[in-house]
């Protein structure tokens, strides 16, 4: 399911990004500036794929290459290392390291995986949370360590291990990489709109030229309207699809913890978290990337009753 949602996300944002890039190239071309997108290697790619060499297909190839480059960069350990430093995340030390590693080793033993494949990190924050990161990292916040007992902490770690085993974090990281490219193209389009608006505010006071400026500005406003509609539709689709996929992954991770014999430990931990609030209301639940805690606790209890 995660891979399918990733493909859908890429297609949706890729299509909209290609349209926006096409508009950017077309608007710049109206000023007599030659396109820089029609490079020989892009034409060669299209010809090898048997696709027509047209402005829009050229933009599609560029967006695909931008996506691919961003995805590769996001996978590089140095990039992930920068994120850890930026968030003040580090490896545990001393007694804390012994405690966490013992908990983690027990969870991995239950799952039949090598604990050395993964690395534990600690973030010195009072927030009660933990999350999987990249391909092989789990970050535990100090607030969670202080709040949970050893049994409950193992339940949380089992849940996070599921995200790594099922590559949920890899899919999430890939989606983030594509969204970064998409947002960069949106920013480029808005900057172009700002430049055009500034130039228009000067030209509209010049006789004769002002008529052409008004016509051109009308076309630009129409294009901007189309882009905003496409942008809204893409975001609306993502807001529904991404949380849906995330909620499926959360339930699967809870079941994974149950299968390791840590379902009740996780349920106890989640029950504690309900004291700090839960997702209420249909709309909030629809767009939330986590199911309501009370539903997750109930599901874990149901699984325990089934044996």
Question: Predicted regions span which residues?
Answer:
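Alpha-helical transmembrane signal-anchor/signal-peptide segments
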Residues: 36-37, 79-90, 247-258
């Amino acid at each position: 399911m995660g891979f399918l949602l990733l493909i859908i996300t890429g297609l949706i944002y890729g299509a909209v990004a290609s349209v926006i890039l096409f508009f950017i190239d077309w608007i710049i071309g109206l000023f007599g500036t030659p396109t820089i997108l029609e490079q020989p290697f892009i034409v060669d790619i299209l010809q090898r794929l048997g696709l027509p060499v047209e402005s829009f297909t050229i933009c599609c190839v560029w967006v695909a290459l931008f996506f691919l480059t961003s995805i590769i960069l996001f996978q590089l350990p140095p990039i992930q290392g920068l994120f850890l430093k930026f968030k003040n995340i580090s490896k545990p030390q001393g007694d804390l390291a012994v405690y966490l590693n013992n908990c983690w080793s027990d969870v991995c033993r239950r799952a039949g995986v090598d604990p050395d494949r993964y690395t534990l990190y600690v973030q010195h924050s009072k927030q009660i949370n933990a999350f999987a990161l990249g391909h092989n990292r789990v970050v535990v916040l100090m607030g969670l360590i202080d709040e949970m007992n050893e049994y409950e902490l193992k339940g949380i770690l089992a849940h996070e291990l599921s995200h790594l085993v099922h590559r949920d974090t890899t899919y999430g990281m890939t989606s983030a990489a594509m969204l970064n490219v998409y947002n960069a193209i949106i920013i480029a389009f808005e900057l172009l709109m700002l430049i055009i608006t500034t130039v228009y505010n000067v030209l509209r006071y010049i006789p004769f030229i002002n008529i052409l400026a008004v016509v051109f500005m009308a076309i630009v406003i129409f294009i901007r309207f189309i882009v905003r509609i496409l942008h809204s539709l893409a975001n609306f689709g993502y807001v529904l699809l991404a949380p849906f996929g995330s909620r499926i992954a959360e339930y699967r991770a809870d079941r994974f913890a149950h299968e390791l014999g840590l379902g009740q430990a996780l349920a106890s931990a989640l029950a504690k978290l309900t004291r700090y609030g839960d997702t209420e209301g249909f709309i909030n639940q629809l767009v939330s990337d986590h199911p309501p805690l009370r539903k997750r606790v109930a599901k874990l209890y149901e699984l325990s009753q089934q044996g």
